[in-house]
Amino acid sequence: MKNKKYLSVFNEIVKLQSKGKLADGIQDIKLEDMDEDMLKGYICSAMNQEPDTGASLKDIAKQALNESEASHPIISVVGNCSECIKKDEKELKCVSSCPFDAIFKDSQAGRIRVDADKCEGCGECVKACSLERIVDKIQYMPIVNLLKDKKVPVYATIAPAYIGQFGDEVTPGKMRTALK
C-alpha cells in the first residue's frame, strides 16, 4: 500500500482493536496536515465502512466490530474533491482510469462517486488519484470477527492483489511463510 497516511490510520485502528478500545478510542486518531473530513474517510474505509453515513466514529466502530461480511464496493472516495470537481469529467484521471465506468463526477454533491453496481474493485482509480482521496476499504474487521467467532471453520485463500498491501518489504515469499 503506497498511501502511508492511510496505512498509518489502519495501524492505529489495529492497535486500538487489539486492546479492546476501538469504539472508545477511535475519535482520538489524529494525523497532522489532514482535514477532519478526509481523516474520517480514512478511518471508516480502514474499518470497511462507508465514510459519508453521518454516523459518529464511535457508532461506526461499533458497527465494524460486529461485522462478519465484507461490503461492496471495496473502493471509497474520502474527503473533499473540490480541486477535481471543477474539472471536466474527461480530464479526471480517476474517472478515465476505470475500465468499468464505475467512477463518476457528481456535480450536485461536489464529489467523485463510486457506482457500487459497476465497481469491480480493480483499484485503477486508487492508483490514478494523486490526491489519495480514493482508497480501497480494508476488509480486516470482518476477517477478525470471523476468526474470533469459532462457530464455523474459516478457510482462506489469498488473491494476487495482496502484493503491496503490506508495504514494499513484504514479498510473496514472506507472505507464504507467514501463512504456514
Provide a role label for each language-model segment:
Residues 1-50, 137-180:
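Iron-sulfur-associated redox domains of electron-transfer enzymes in respiratory
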Residues 39-69, 93-94, 120-126, 160-162, ...:
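Short, charged N-terminal helix-start/capping segments
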Residues 55-105:
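N-terminal [4Fe-4S]-dependent radical SAM core
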Residues 62-65, 109-114, 143-148:
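Short, functional N-terminal and low-complexity linear motifs
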Residues 70-72, 116-120, 151-156:
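Short amphipathic alpha-helical segments, especially helix-boundary/capping motifs
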Residues 76-77, 108, 122, 158:
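Generic signal for short, ordered secondary-structure residues
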Residues 81-82, 112-113, 161-166:
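Short, contiguous strand/loop micro-motifs
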Residues 83-115, 120, 124-140:
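Iron-sulfur cluster-binding cysteine motifs and their immediate structural context
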